[in-house]
Amino acid sequence: MDTKMTEREKMTKGLMYDPGDEELCKGRTEARQLIHRFNNSMDKLERKDITKQLFGSTGEKIYLEPTLRVDYGYNIHVGENFYANFGAIFLDICPITIGKNAMLAPNVQLYSATHPIDPTERNSGLEFGKPITIGDNAWIGGGAIILPGVTLGDNVVVGSGAVVTRSFGSNVVIAGNPAKVIKEIPVKSE
């Protein structure tokens, strides 16, 4: 029995993989074709349909503004009532999972892709990634950058321009470069 993983399987699991693999090149090309249609459509229902084809999973109520950029799309999972403003970038070589009622302001960048620190390894052309997870009710401010391996809990607010280099729990406002907790968010009981 052959248990050899494909480059796509390695990529999605966060292992070193070859981005020049034929299947991965085809996946990026297919994603770019869908993105081109999305970014040039004036019809919001058509854009929603394209998003549902492109993303791995979505809630029913989603809205994304053009322009949108992704690597593959199939590693992006967004919950119900998701909104992304203009210029969202998803480098989705590993899963990017976003909960329900989440909002991305303009030019938010989510990078699950990374490269080896060692120059010899980096020059080999192999890459790897780390998943990004964002909880329910998150609001990511304009121009924020979320780096590989970050997990943000529920009800997190990320200030505009923040560079999020590490994970944070629920109910906090974070901002800065690198991002740090600015304040805790009191949660009202229902």
Swiss-Prot record:
It is an enzyme of class 2 (transferase). CDD domains: LbH_MAT_GAT (cd03357). SUPFAM superfamilies: Trimeric LpxA-like enzymes. Keywords: Acyltransferase, Transferase. The keyword Cytoplasm does not apply. Its EC number is 2.3.1.-. One of its GO terms (molecular function) is acetyltransferase activity. Belongs to the transferase hexapeptide repeat family. PANTHER family: ACETYLTRANSFERASE C18B11.09C-RELATED, SIALIC ACID SYNTHASE-RELATED. This is Putative acetyltransferase DDB_G0275913.
